Structures are given as structure tokens and as C-alpha cells.
Amino acid sequence: MTKTPFKTKYGQGSKVCKRCGRKGPGIIRKYGLNLCRQCFRELAPKLGFKKYD
């Protein structure tokens, strides 16, 4: 009998990037983005975010 992997319902492991599927603490969920920080940096200009000095 093998163990079946269970789906995490809460915590950092339950949040995934909707673009690349990466898990962990680098997920940006504000405004319903659900992107990891690397994907967010690539898409931010297209989404209308501006980088200020």
C-alpha cells in the first residue's frame, strides 16, 4: 500500500503561481494576482505597475 500525496489546504505550500506553478513564500496574492515574484517582475509593466525610485 502506497501513501497518496495530500493537497495542502492552508499555509505557504497551498499557494501556487498561476503562471509557472511555483510554490512558497514568494507568491504575490494582492489584487488576486497569485503570481510568484519572478513572474510578477516580468509582467508588471504590462499590468500597469510602475517602478519608482
UniProtKB/Swiss-Prot annotation:
Domain of life: Archaea
Reported cofactor(s): Zn(2+)
Keyword Kinase applies: no
Gene Ontology biological process terms from the UniProt entry: cytoplasmic translation
An annotated GO cellular component: cytosolic small ribosomal subunit
UniProt: Zn(2+) binding residues: C17, C20, C36, C39
InterPro entries on file: Ribosomal_uS14, Ribosomal_uS14_arc, Ribosomal_uS14_CS, RIbosomal_uS14_euk_arc, Ribosomal_uS14_sf
Bound cofactor: record note: Binds 1 zinc ion per subunit.
GO molecular function: rRNA binding; structural constituent of ribosome; zinc ion binding
Subunit structure of this chain's protein: Part of the 30S ribosomal subunit.
NCBIfam families xrefs: PRK05766.1 (NF004424)
PANTHER family per UniProt: 40S RIBOSOMAL PROTEIN S29
Family (UniProt): Belongs to the universal ribosomal protein uS14 family. Zinc-binding uS14 subfamily.
Protein name: Small ribosomal subunit protein uS14
Organism: Methanococcus maripaludis (strain DSM 14266 / JCM 13030 / NBRC 101832 / S2 / LL)
Organism lineage: Archaea, Methanobacteriati, Methanobacteriota, Methanomada group, Methanococci
